[in-house]
Amino acid sequence: MIIGHKRILDFLKKSVANKHLAHAYLFAGPSHLGKRRVATEFIKMLNGQEAGENIDPDVLIVEPEILEKEGVIKELEIGISQARRIQHQMSLFPYQASYKIALIDRAGRMTREASNCLLKTLEEPTGKAILILITSNSRLLLPTIVSRCQLINFLPVKESEIKKGISDKSLDDKTLSQIVRLSNGRPGLAIQYLNDQSLLEDQNKIISQLEKLLRMDINDRYQYVEKIAKDVPKARQILNYWLFWFRDLLLLGTGCPDLVLYSQALPYKGSYSLPKLKKIIQTIKKTDWYLSNSSINARLALEVLMLEI
């Protein structure tokens, strides 16, 4: 099920119908907007069937692998060997479908070597091959890669569309409205909350933990960091919730209380100056970027953040 993005879907349908296709597409926008779902639908438009997880000989799906080692969970980078698989895929003629397709999810996780290998593929496109890249931040890609792709920007979806898309008779209107509001224009999050409402409780626990953290001394903060740094994907999820909490404080400080997501932020109105809040938000974003890079020490990056908040 795809919620929203009608303009993008109509554009892709028209491109397929008119056979006016680019050799490469870049689907860019914040996480949980539905970029992967739209990409899968696009592949179905092109080849007339669902994109299986690498069971279709004409479709190759590449994404970062998750590694757990000595109790530490990390998302690996997309390396040169995976880029060469893509290069090989794009050099072949379709086996039974109309196009050879390679989809790279979280393309910003490519190493420099992998990026350069992919660039060579883009510089020598073949007529029956299409590459789809998905990223939450196009600035993580080489500018030369971005310039060779048809850029498709994904924007947050209207609350009314999300509410209609996830309408569930088993939910009371208050819970449904809460899910829609907390999704903040991201249908993927709304679906996650709908399928597992314990995530709403987890989110509240994370915000409560943040409130406690703000009252801790630096040694206790570092102990907390040592714990969460062992699971980098989870740590990034925590940072995302923190980001919206501090964003709420910024909204309160600028006279926009109706846009606040977390009611827990209300008592903290005025606790930080606006310049300080902007700096904290920038630091959280920077820390999240550091955590997305598996070569950077996650614990060190989080400790630096503790000094800022």
Whereabouts are the PLM-identified features?
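A short beta-strand-to-loop transition that corresponds to the Sensor-1 phosphate-sensing loop
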Residues: 105-106, 133-138
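Conserved adenine-binding aromatic site and its adjacent loop/helix in ATP-hydrolyzing domains
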Residues: 88, 120, 147
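Clamp-loader machinery-focused feature within the broader ASCE/P-loop NTPase space
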Residues: 1-113
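Residues immediately C-terminal
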Residues: 109, 124, 140
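Charged, glycine-rich active-site and insertion segments that engage polyanionic ligands
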Residues: 1-45, 49-51, 127-129, 137-241, ...
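Conserved catalytic/switch belt of AAA+ P-loop NTPases
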Residues: 91, 116-133
